[in-house]
Curated annotation (Swiss-Prot):
Name under which the protein is recorded: Probable ATP-dependent RNA helicase DDX41
GO MF terms held by the record: ATP binding; ATP hydrolysis activity; DNA binding; mRNA binding; RNA binding; RNA helicase activity; zinc ion binding
Organism the protein comes from: Homo sapiens
Maturation and modification: Acetylation at Lys-9 regulates the nuclear/cytoplasmic localization.
Classification via SUPFAM superfamilies: P-loop containing nucleoside triphosphate hydrolases
Amino acid sequence: MEESEPERKRARTDEVPAGGSRSEAEDEDDEDYVPYVPLRQRRQLLLQKLLQRRRKGAAEEEQQDSGSEPRGDEDDIPLGPQSNVSLLDQHQHLKEKAEARKESAKEKQLKEEEKILESVAEGRALMSVKEMAKGITYDDPIKTSWTPPRYVLSMSEERHERVRKKYHILVEGDGIPPPIKSFKEMKFPAAILRGLKKKGIHHPTPIQIQGIPTILSGRDMIGIAFTGSGKTLVFTLPVIMFCLEQEKRLPFSKREGPYGLIICPSRELARQTHGILEYYCRLLQEDSSPLLRCALCIGGMSVKEQMETIRHGVHMMVATPGRLMDLLQKKMVSLDICRYLALDEADRMIDMGFEGDIRTIFSYFKGQRQTLLFSATMPKKIQNFAKSALVKPVTINVGRAGAASLDVIQEVEYVKEEAKMVYLLECLQKTPPPVLIFAEKKADVDAIHEYLLLKGVEAVAIHGGKDQEERTKAIEAFREGKKDVLVATDVASKGLDFPAIQHVINYDMPEEIENYVHRIGRTGRSGNTGIATTFINKACDESVLMDLKALLLEAKQKVPPVLQVLHCGDESMLDIGGERGCAFCGGLGHRITDCPKLEAMQTKQVSNIGRKDYLAHSSMDF
C-alpha cells in the first residue's frame, strides 16, 4: 500500500505548539496578516468598484439637472440576490426612492406653474396712467369717522378669531377690524334697521359680519363669498352711510358728485343694485334724513333721463363700464369728489375685457379712493392682479373662491342633443314656478322660448341681442310672478337676485366652470334650498366635465356614472402648492398647465398677431 502524500498546509497555523506558548512577535504577525485573494477575484472587485462610481456619477448629474439635492451614500444600497440586504429593506428603499422621485416631479410642476402665472400676469398695476406716470402711491387707507362699539374694541383678538372660525370666515391683511354680529352694533340708523326687517333680514350673514365693519373702517377690500350670501348689502349700506355723513356736513350742490361709484358688468345687475340703494335712501328720507340721490347710468337708456338726476347733484352712481366711460369722456360726469369705488363681479369684468375701461375710469379720480372688489369666483391670478389697485387690502373669504353654494342640490343628467328640448318639459315638472333656464347661445334661447310658448308655458327670454326695454320688461314680469319661466344667456347669471326661484336648468354645460357656479347660484339664496339640473352629453369639453366632477365631490353631491369614469391621471397632482386646481380659471379638475381657458386665450392672441389696422381713423378702407 502506497503512502499517501502529506496534506499541504499554509505557513500560518492557529495551533499552539505543544509544550510552549506563542511569542508576542507571533501575535503581532497574526494581527497584520492579510488573507490571500486570487487574481481573478481581485479583478472582479475592481470592476464592481468602477461600475459603482460610474453609476453614482450619472445619478448625481441627473439630480443636478432636475434641481434636487444629491443624495448621500446611504441611498446606494446594492440590490439583488447577491446583496446582504433583506427583501423587506430592499422594498422600503425602493419605496423611498419612488416617493423622492414623486416629490421632485411636484416641485417641477410648481416651478412650471409659477413661470406660466408670471407670463400671463399683467405687468402694469391696476392703477390710472396718471398715478403710474407721477409715481403716486398711497401708504395708508382712507380714514372715516366710524368706529366699532367700545365693548367690541375691548374684546380680545382670541374672541374675534373664535367668531371667524365659527362662521368659516378666512381673513388676510394687517389690522383687520373686528367682526360684528348685529346690524344695530354696526351703528346703522333705525330706518335702515326697519327696512332690513321688512325684507326678512334679521341677522348679518358671514360675509356681512366681517365685511361691513371692514368697509365702514375705510379699508380697501376683496370680498369672496358664494352666490346668494348677501354681498350686495356689504357695499351698498356703507356707501349710503358715507353719503349721508357728507350731505349732513355740507349739502351737495348742482352738478356735484357722485361721492360713491358702483360698477357692474351687466345692465340688469346695475338696475338691481340701483333699486336696493333707492329703497334704503327712501326709508331714510321718510325718517327725516336728507334726500340722497342715486343715478343709474347704463346702456340702452336715454342719456337725457340719466343727466336729469346728475344735474341736481348726485350722491351715488351705479353704472356699467361702457356708458360710464362715454359720460366721462364727454365731461357729463365728474369723479373729482368720488372717494368710494365698488366693483361688483370684479373678476368677470377684468376677465371679460373691461380691464382697459376700468383703468381709464381710474384715471378720472382726483385723489385717493376706497376700492372694493366682490365676486363669488376669484381665481388667484385675478386676486394678485386686483391687489395692485388696493392700499393695505383686507381679503375676506367665506368658503373657497369659486365653490358652489351648499344650499343647491346639483343634479347632472346625460341627455342627447336631439332629446334636450323634449326632456326640458319633464324637468319643469320637478318644482313649482318660477324656473330659470340657461343656454350658452342666443339662438338656443330663442328656440327654447318659442318651443315653451307653443306648449302653453308662460315664458320670457333675455339675451344680449334684445333691446334694453324688452330685457327690462321681461325681468320685471318674471320677478313679479306674471311669467313662470325665464330663458336667458349668461347675461342673467351674474348677481341677479330672484328670491323665489327653486329650480335652475342648464340647457347646456357652460364652457367655463365659473359660469356654472354663477348660474346655479340664482337658486338656493338667503338660506333657502334650490335644485340645479344640468344637461351634459358628448359635445361637452372633457376638461370642464372634470372640473364639474371635482365641484360635485367638494359639495358632497351625487356624481353620475358618466362623470365617475372620467380620470385626470395623477389626482394627487391637483392639490399641490397649497392651492387646489387651476390658479388661472379656478377649475378644480385640472392645473394651470392644462387649462383650456388659458390655451384658448393664447391661441386668440397668436391669431391676432399681424392683424392690426394700419389705416388712420378718418381714412376710408378701399
